[in-house]
């Protein structure tokens, strides 16, 4: 019997006895191995078979499992007990986690089977998934192009139909931007909505775990599982919610504000996708208008002057003494120096150096402190915009997937890839990237583009509802790349 390749349909089929967790696991592993050229995964979970058997046992005992047997891939900075967590870095190449992140454990508790770990930019520092010690991940729409980052492996796993859903992390756009460049949904929840316990830290005041999916219903399903308070995460929020995909009638009366500062510098295909989405919203009964976030022009600078100092502090623990690889040396100082020199890649070293400089005596007020003031201003400007509009909209990325190597020698150009996404993290808001169209590149290659919707804090469920409503009126441009159709 053919089952639709969504988490919702697969869980229903397993519960009804139409297929088994082991059969779905075998299928996912076979598809991952067949698509190994994409380099979406860095490892398979050796415990997955035992997880599948446990799901079958629990179902036989009468348990109701919302993710019964659903194969899931998680980013390689989300700890799963007994598996390697490398964060895409040589320094953690042999590190095996002794515990499981709360988000991953909630997936397992709900009946999901974790197939493996997804490739990523080293320590989540990048926008292309090119800096991983395991090599770059390829975009299934065009193998010469990047999938975005830093959660490129998680995005590709869903775009190429290896699994119906996956988890990534978003510090400045690392779920939304690769979702846009690979043509799937990517949701960045409100800061604190999903526990960060067990997520390897990059910038602790910005990091947030979020899901990738191919349907609004699957986003709702995952968020109902992973969201919720966790006493082991001091930033976790007590904010119960019920996520549900919306219907076309939910668009009636919705007030949508287009952020004026996001309208310049986009490719024509990105502008066309945004305009088509706005037309669909108006046809569905929503109203649209423009709104200004004046300090958005300072968001990139403020973001990196906050993220890099936090990274320099968080990554100080990787010194060869406790975690990961250790380089030989004649004394402690030499061991630490060589361990970090050989263990960290070039981009990570760059960000640690800049972050340390920004925190140093005499420069703290000029850089980090000033960036924090800009952060507060941006948050206030978003709050004012939400007094007039229910949601805000921008392109997710000003351009579609770029070629591998195109921006690696120009860090500023790579940082600018996040121009439409970083402000959301600075303000701690929820945002979603929705597949909105395609750019036609040379040779007739279709490259996905995305549109980003932003909601007030703790209104994450509104974004999932909106995604479902747009699906219902045919405004979501979701497809599979050639050679990677759903099973």
Curated annotation (Swiss-Prot):
It comes from Deinococcus deserti (strain DSM 17065 / CIP 109153 / LMG 22923 / VCD115). The active site is at 75 (charge relay system), 150 (charge relay system), 174 (acyl-ester intermediate). Its EC number is 6.3.5.7. Heterotrimer of A, B and C subunits. GO terms for cellular component: glutamyl-tRNA(Gln) amidotransferase complex. GO terms for biological process: translation. PROSITE patterns: AMIDASES. Allows the formation of correctly charged Gln-tRNA(Gln) through the transamidation of misacylated Glu-tRNA(Gln) in organisms which lack glutaminyl-tRNA synthetase. The reaction takes place in the presence of glutamine and ATP through an activated gamma-phospho-Glu-tRNA(Gln). This is Glutamyl-tRNA(Gln) amidotransferase subunit A. It comes from the Bacteria. Pfam families: Amidase. GO terms for molecular function: ATP binding; glutaminyl-tRNA synthase (glutamine-hydrolyzing) activity. Keywords: ATP-binding, Ligase, Nucleotide-binding, Protein biosynthesis. Belongs to the amidase family. GatA subfamily.
């Amino acid at each position: 019997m053919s089952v639709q390749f969504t988490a919702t349909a697969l869980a229903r089929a397993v519960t009804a006895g139409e297929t088994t967790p082991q059969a779905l696991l075998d299928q996912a592993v076979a598809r991952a191995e067949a698509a190994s050229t994409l380099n979406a995964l860095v490892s398979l979970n050796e415990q997955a078979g035992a997880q599948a058997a446990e799901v079958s046992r629990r179902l036989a005992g009468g348990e109701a499992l919302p993710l019964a047997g659903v194969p899931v891939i998680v980013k390689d900075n989300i700890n799963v007990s007994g598996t390697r967590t490398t964060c895409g870095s040589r320094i953690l190449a042999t590190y095996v986690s002794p515990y499981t992140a709360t988000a991953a454990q909630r997936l397992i508790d709900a009946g999901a089977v974790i197939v493996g770990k997804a490739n990523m930019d080293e320590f989540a520092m990048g926008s292309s998934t090119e800096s991983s010690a395991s090599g770059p991940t390829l975009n299934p729409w065009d193998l010469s192009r990047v999938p975005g980052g830093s959660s490129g492996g998680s995005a590709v796993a869903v775009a190429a139909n290896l699994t119906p859903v996956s988890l990534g992390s978003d510090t400045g756009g690392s779920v939304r931007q690769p979702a846009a460049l690979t043509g799937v949904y990517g949701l960045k929840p409100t800061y604190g909505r999903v526990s960060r316990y067990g997520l390897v830290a990059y910038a602790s005041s910005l990091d947030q775990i979020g899901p990738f999916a191919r349907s609004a219903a699957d986003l709702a399903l995952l968020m109902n599982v992973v969201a919720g308070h966790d006493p082991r995460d001091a930033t976790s929020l007590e904010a119960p919610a019920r996520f549900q995909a919306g219907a076309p009638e939910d668009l009636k009366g919705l007030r949508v504000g287009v952020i004026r500062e996001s309208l310049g510098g986009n490719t024509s295909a990105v502008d066309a996708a945004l305009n088509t989405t706005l037309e669909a919203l108006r046809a569905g009964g929503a109203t649209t208008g423009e709104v200004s976030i004046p300090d958005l022009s300072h968001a990139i600078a403020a973001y990196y002057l906050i993220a890099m100092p936090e990274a320099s502090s968080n990554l100080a623990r990787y010194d060869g003494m406790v975690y990961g690889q250790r380089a030989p040396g004649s004394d402690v100082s030499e061991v630490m120096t060589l361990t970090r020199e050989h263990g960290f890649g070039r981009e990570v070293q760059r960000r640690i150096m800049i972050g340390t400089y920004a925190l140093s005596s005499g420069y703290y007020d000029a850089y980090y402190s000033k960036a924090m003031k800009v952060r507060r201003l941006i948050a206030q400007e978003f709050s004012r915009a939400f007094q007039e509009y229910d949601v805000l909209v921008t392109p997710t990325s000003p351009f579609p997937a770029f070629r591998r190597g195109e921006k690696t020698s120009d860090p500023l150009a790579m940082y600018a890839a996040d121009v439409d996404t970083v402000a959301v993290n600075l303000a701690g808001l929820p945002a979603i990237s929705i597949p909105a169209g395609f750019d036609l590149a040379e040779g007739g290659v279709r490259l996905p583009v995305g549109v980003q919707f932003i909601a007030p804090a703790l209104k994450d469920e509104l974004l999932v509802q909106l995604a479902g409503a747009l699906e219902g009126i045919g405004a979501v441009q979701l497809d599979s790349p050639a050679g990677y159709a759903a099973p």
